[in-house]
């Protein structure tokens, strides 16, 4: 089953269509996942502070999947001024091991550096 999911992730850029995620200025968190992996959605992302939060479904936004080299979902990427600063990826079971506290600490570190 995991092999099938991995194959689906790799094939999505070929068979899907794009909504094109836009990563802009400032401190942003993008939570990449896929509709077929909603059971492993990272619910706590919405609780992060001092940043803009975006969601991206790689099943429908295959350009973003390719551009940001998403190979496993969920993946959380912290962007600052459009540049990737930190990436948190799920393990082989498609479960996120990073915690709200860990990601918030990194956000606070970056947010503090901007002042």
Where in this protein do the model-derived segments appear?
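Extracytoplasmic/periplasmic, Sec-exported soluble proteins
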Residues: 57, 68, 95-99
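Residue-level detector of flexible, active-site-proximal loop/helix-junction positions
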Residues: 36, 60, 92
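Structural micro-motif
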Residues: 68-80
């Amino acid at each position: 089953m995991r092999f099938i999911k991995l194959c689906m992730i790799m094939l999505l850029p070929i068979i899907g269509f794009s909504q094109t995620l836009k990563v802009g200025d400032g401190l942003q968190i993008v939570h990449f996942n896929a509709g077929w992996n909603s059971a492993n959605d990272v619910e706590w992302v919405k609780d992060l502070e001092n940043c803009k939060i975006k969601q991206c479904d790689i099943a429908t936004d295959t350009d973003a999947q390719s551009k940001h080299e998403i190979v496993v979902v969920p993946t959380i990427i912290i962007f600052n001024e459009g540049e990737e600063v930190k990436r948190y990826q799920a393990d082989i079971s498609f479960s996120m091991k990073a915690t709200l506290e860990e990601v918030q600490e990194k956000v606070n570190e970056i947010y503090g550096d901007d002042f």
